[in-house]
Amino acid sequence: MQFNIKLQNDFKNNIRREWALTNGLGGYAGGSVTGAINRTHQGYLIASLHAPVQRYVCFSKTNEKIVTGSHTYDLSSDQFKGGCHTDGIQYIREFTYDGTICFTYEAGDITIKKHIALAQGKNLAAVAYEVQNKGEAAKLLITPLMNFREHSESSTVDSLKFEVQKQEHGFTLIPKAQDDHCIRIAFSGGELIERDDKYICDLEAQTEVDNEVPGLDCAFCPYDVSVDIPAGASMHFSIMCDIVPLEACNGNAGSAFAKHLVSDNESAFEILRAQLDYTDELIKRSGFIDDFAVKLTVAANQFIAHRQSTGYDTVLAGLPWFTDWGRDTMISYTGLTLCTGRFEKAHDILLTFAKYCKDGLIPNMFPDSGLKPLYNTVDASLWYFYAVYKYLEYVNTPDAYEFIKKDIYPCLKDIISTYKKGTDFSIYMDTDGLIHAGSGLDQVTWMDVRVGDWVATPRHGKPVEINALWYNALCTMDMLQAKFGDNDDSYRQLASLVKTSFNKRFWNENTGCLYDVVDEDDDTIRPNQIYAVSLPFTMLDKEREKAIVDTVMDKLYVGCGLRSLDPDHKDYHPIYIGSLSKRDHAYHQGTAWGFLLGGFISAYVKVNGRTKATALCADKLLDPVREHLLNNCIGSICEIFDGDAPHNGRGCYAQAWSVGEVLRCYCEDVLPMLPQAHS
C-alpha cells in the first residue's frame, strides 16, 4: 500500500494536501505534503497525555539546510504571516505515504530521504534520514522546531518558556506551563549548536486563514544539529522525540535516552520498520487484496485508540480534533473493525460504551478535557443496536453470543425500556409507537448545530432516521430474545405498531419520498431518509424504497457524499468556508457528508438488485472517493465536502465514519459481486 505524489514545485496548490499518522493512544502527527504546517492541529508529535485526550503539540517539525562549498540549499517549507513562504518545495522530488511518511529531496549532488513515523502505543516520534552524497563533502543542518501547547491553541514567545537541559546528543525541555512532564529529543550523532535566535514566529497555517482566524504559531528552537556528510558517502541519521512524566527525566534519564540512540543509530529506522510491519499486518488480517479496500483498511486503523479511563479501545470520530463520539463510533464501527477482521477491537468498543450507558443513553461524546461524557443524543443508543447486530453477523460464534448476552444485552434492554418510558432531552415513545426527540435548544440528532440561542436545524418531533433506527432496534431485540430464550414477544408486537405508524405518517405523496420530521411535518428533502431503506430491518415496500433512492440520487448525491439539503431549498448553503458563523450555516444546510455514502450505496444495491451490473454501477459511484484519496488527507476521506462543484473536502481531513461507511458498503455490497478486484 503506497501513495506516491510528484509536487512539481507548486506550493499554493499543494499546501492543502495533507498527511496524518497516529499512535493508537489518541496522539498523532500531521502536516502538508509541501513540508509546511497547514493547520494549528499539526506537527510531528501531538501527544495524548491521558489517552485518548489531553493532546499537546510537542514537536512541530524539523527544517533542513544543506551546506556544500559556498552554496546553501534551504529545504524548509514554511508559510509566514501574509502568505509568503520559503521554497523548499522546489527540492522535493516525491512525497510518499505507506503507513509512514517520506519526503525525497534532491539538492545538488545530495539526495535525502526524510522518513517520519510514530511508535504504536507510545508518545514517541521518529525522524529517520537516508543521505546519499555523490559530490563533495557537505553539512546537513537540522533545526528542530519545538512546542508545547494544547493542539487547538497557538503558541507565542511568552507562552513558550522551558527549562532546557542539554545533553551530549540531545536535550530535554520542561515546560514551565506544565512542569509535570518533560520533552526529550535525541540525535544519533552530529554537533549541537546553540542558536542566537531561539524562536521562529509568525508561522501561518493556511487552513486557519481560510477559516478567518489568525492561525499564527511560534516555535522554540534552542539548537541546530550539524551533521557532516563525507564526499561520496551514504549514511543514516536519526532523531527521536518523546514526552514523559517528569520523573523519567530526573537524574541521567534524559541523557540515557540520547545515549541509547547514539549507541544504536538505527533506532528511528527500527520504529520506521516496525510501523511498516504493523501496516502490513493490518492488511494481512483484513484479507483484502483489492487496492481500494486495502487503502481504506489502513485509513481505518487511524481512528482506533486506547481509552485510559476504561482500559478498552474506542473510536476517535475524526482527525485532527474530534474525540470519541458515540454516534460516530457506532456508524463507523462495522467498517473500521469488522470488515477489517479486528474482532477483538470490536469487542472492546462495545464494552467501552456499555460501561457508560446512563438513563438509557450511551454517550454522545467524551470531551477532550477528559471530563464526564455528554449524553445529548437520541440516535447513538439506537446505532448501538446496529453495531451489536453487525458484530454477531460477522463474528457469529457461541462466544460472541455469550459475550452479548452477558455484557451487552442488559444495556440493550435498558435502552428500549427507557425510550418507551421517556428519558432526558424530550426523548420518549408516543402512543403511535414512534420516538419523539428534542425540544427548545436541545439538538439531539446528528444535525446538531447550535450557536447561542440559534438552532440551525431544530428537527424537533419524530425524525425519520430515528424511527427507522427504532424499528431496527426492536427487530434486533426480538432476534436476541429468541436466541437467548426469553420468550418475550413484546418487541415484535411493538415493531409491528411502529411499522404501521411509520408508513402512515412519513410517506409524502407530494415529494414521492419521506418527510424528514413529523409531527410538525417537515417536507424538506434531506438524506436522513436513506436509512429507512439501508438498515438490516426496514418497513417500506419496494416501490417506496426505490423512489427514495432515486430522489436522493437526483437531489443529493455529489460523488464523495450526499448533500445535507436539497439544493433547490431556499436555505441551501453549499460552501463550507470562512468564519465559524458562515461554516455553521452550511454544516447541515447544503454541505455534503462522506459517511452518508455508506447507507446510500447499500440502499442503491438493495433496490436495484444484488447483481454484477448493479455492483459495477455502484463501484462507479465510488470513483470520486478513489480520486479523493490522493487529495486533502492522503489515503483518507474528509468529514464533509462543499455541496457545489468542485466539492472541495472540508472539516476534519480524515473522518472515521466517512472511512468506515465507505469501506463497509464497498466490502458488503460492491466488492463481492465485482467480476474481479481492482489491482
Locate each region found by the language model.
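Extended, well-ordered alpha-helical scaffold segments
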Residues: 252-288, 292-299, 341-355, 399-421, ...
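Active-site-adjacent "gating/activation" loops or surface patches in catalytic cores
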Residues: 297-315
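Terminal accessory carbohydrate-recognition/targeting modules of carbohydrate-active enzymes
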Residues: 1-288, 320, 327, 338, ...
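Non-catalytic C-terminal accessory modules of carbohydrate-active enzymes
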Residues: 73-100, 107-111, 421, 550-558, ...
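Carbohydrate-binding/catalytic loop surfaces
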Residues: 310-324, 363-383, 387, 391, ...
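Aromatic-rich carbohydrate-recognition surfaces in CAZymes
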Residues: 133, 155-157, 229, 323-329, ...
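Catalytic cores of carbohydrate-active enzymes
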Residues: 363-364, 417-420, 427-430, 471-576, ...
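Short helix-capping and inter-helix turn/linker motifs at the boundaries of alpha-helical repeat units
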Residues: 119, 291, 309-310, 323-327, ...
